[in-house]
């Protein structure tokens, strides 16, 4: 006897599998397009369609399938995070926690957008709710415990600086806003085609053309006519090329590193040279801030610059200081075994001149590697050594400029150059030049050091400042005020280069006001969340009332 085949069940299974496959493909497509748009692949136009598959997917997922939307968006963002920042593994496997957490945070943002849209404005116009949610999230990436602004959408245009000269007014948040609006309008056009309503289709097409093209047209015109402002200042950049894994932190190489800096820069020094800029963490002998006169490296460099009139040396190093009494419970404080003493460790930038020593400590510390959140304090018991970092460093509470020969200079250290508002705060305090010092050799010959180099282009535009960038083994160079690369070195080659940069004292709108667009987005997000919660409670009350009415009628 033949068993009956459940044709209806088989058909339902096929119907379910079809949409599931489609949704997974759309999620992966968004991750792939975001990756293809990102520096250093540099196909920036892909960013304008990257969110479209995910927005279409969101329209397919019903309100009752909330969990499915979360995991599909997580898939999209996990693909993007891993494919774009896989090189983090080269520095420390622990830092790959950023892949997982950042994808989870992004998925949570998209999931909240999905829930709010379904409840507040469940049609294509509701897609605009994503904008304040995403921009508020990007603001958080600069400020919460695990800071990771590397993938903030506005950074994508570092490969197309002629398109975003207006960053001097908006910062990268303006780029994020631009990207999201264009993606949403394209998604809306496709979704309105299903309704066959001509008016909304034409409105979206018109808006799309204006919003996509007008910023490019205006920016290209500004780019064509902009000229660097300020006074001429001669700067030398040194790429010492000391292997951070095998040499730089070995005490047998301490003196050689300093001598390499002198030997590389000396042939380029002229009476007009004002600054020599070298890399992050180049001095490793251990400088105690209360007795800097005992540091051999500082004395050697002081003697070097004193041979010339009006010459200074900017370089990175590890510094230490005692923890003040009563501050022993401060999380970054480190205990000296067998004593009652505690000390702080800093990743510092030092300016050495005939007038003495100035320093600032890195504030925006690299998550896990340099800064362990207190809730992850258990990691302090493990050796997470990457260069100078083991456990948590102590940073300055705010930016600090250093002065020399009438100049105020900003010296962002490594990761800090990814923080637009923070770099702008130096310029708001009068910095007329920016010197980025970094040690990108941890990542090897990967997209990591190349992406990091690209971000300096955007910092130059945001602040209209020339930038000198020294990378130990990555890529060093000079940038003008419109984000062009004036000179650059080759990877893993010792070198020194020289340029005359314009020191500009004019403060841009963005440097004065910071990420104001993202702060506005936070307020809008708050209103939308309150509206969603209130409407959810109202609908819940209506449903309960309707259920009771139905029950009474049945009785």
Where are these regions (language model features)?
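Membrane-embedded alpha-helical bundles of multi-pass enzymes
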Residues: 2-226, 445, 456, 471, ...
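Non-cytosolic juxtamembrane linkers/loops
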Residues: 211-270, 439-452, 457-464, 468-469, ...
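Active-site catalytic loop in hydrolytic enzyme cores
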Residues: 88-91, 140-172, 299, 334-420, ...
């Amino acid at each position: 006897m033949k068993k009956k085949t459940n044709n209806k069940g088989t058909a339902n299974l096929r119907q379910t599998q079809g949409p599931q496959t489609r949704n997974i493909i759309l999620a992966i497509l968004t991750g792939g397009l975001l990756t293809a748009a990102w520096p250093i692949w540099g196909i920036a136009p892909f960013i304008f369609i990257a969110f479209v598959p995910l927005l279409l997917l969101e329209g397919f997922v019903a309100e009752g399938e909330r969990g499915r939307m979360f995991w599909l968006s997580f898939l999209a963002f996990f693909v993007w995070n891993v494919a774009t920042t896989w090189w983090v593994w080269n520095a420390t496997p622990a830092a790959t926690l950023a892949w997982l957490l950042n994808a989870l945070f992004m998925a949570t943002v998209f999931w909240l957008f999905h829930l709010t849209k379904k409840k507040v404005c469940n049609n294509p116009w509701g897609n605009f709710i994503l904008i304040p949610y995403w921009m508020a999230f990007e603001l958080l990436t600069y400020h919460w415990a695990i800071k990771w602004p590397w993938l903030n959408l506005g950074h994508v245009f570092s490969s197309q600086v002629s398109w975003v000269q207006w960053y001097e007014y908006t910062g990268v948040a303006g780029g994020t806003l631009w990207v999201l609006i264009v993606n949403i309008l394209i998604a809306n056009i496709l979704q309105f085609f299903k309704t066959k309503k001509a008016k909304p289709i034409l409105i979206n097409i018109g808006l799309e053309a204006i919003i996509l093209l007008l910023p490019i047209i205006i920016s290209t015109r500004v780019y064509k006519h902009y000229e660097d402002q300020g006074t001429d200042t001669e700067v030398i950049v040194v790429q010492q090329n000391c292997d951070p894994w095998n040499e730089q932190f070995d005490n047998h190489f301490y003196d050689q590193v300093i001598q390499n800096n002198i030997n590389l820069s000396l042939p380029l020094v002229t009476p007009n040279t004002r600054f020599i800029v070298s890399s992050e963490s180049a001095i490793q002998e251990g400088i105690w801030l209360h007795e800097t006169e005992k540091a051999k490296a500082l004395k050697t460099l002081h003697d070097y610059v004193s041979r010339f009139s009006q010459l200074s040396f900017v370089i990175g190093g590890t510094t230490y200081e005692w923890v003040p009494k009563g501050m022993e419970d401060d999380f970054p404080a480190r205990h000296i075994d067998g004593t009652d003493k505690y000390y702080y460790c800093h990743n510092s930038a030092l300016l050495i001149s005939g007038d003495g020593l100035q320093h600032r400590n890195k504030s925006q510390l690299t998550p896990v590697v340099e800064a362990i959140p207190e809730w992850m304090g258990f990691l302090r018991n493990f050796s997470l050594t990457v260069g100078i970092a083991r456990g948590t460093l102590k940073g300055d509470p705010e930016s600090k400029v250093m002065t020399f020969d009438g100049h105020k200079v900003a010296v962002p250290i490594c990761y800090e150059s990814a923080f637009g508002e923070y770099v702008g705060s130096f310029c708001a305090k009068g910095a007329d030049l920016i010197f980025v010092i970094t040690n990108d050799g941890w990542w090897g010959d990967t997209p990591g050091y190349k992406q990091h180099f690209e971000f300096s282009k955007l910092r130059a535009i945001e602040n209209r400042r020339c930038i000198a960038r020294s990378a130990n083994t990555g890529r060093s160079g000079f940038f003008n005020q419109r984000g062009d690369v004036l000179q650059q070195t080759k990877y893993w080659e010792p070198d020194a280069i020289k340029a005359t940069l314009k020191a500009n004292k004019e403060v841009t709108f963005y440097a004065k006001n910071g990420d104001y667009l993202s702060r506005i987005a936070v307020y809008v997000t708050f209103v939308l969340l309150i509206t969603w919660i209130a409407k959810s409670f109202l609908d819940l009350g209506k449903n309960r009332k309707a259920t009771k009415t139905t029950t009474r009628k049945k009785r």
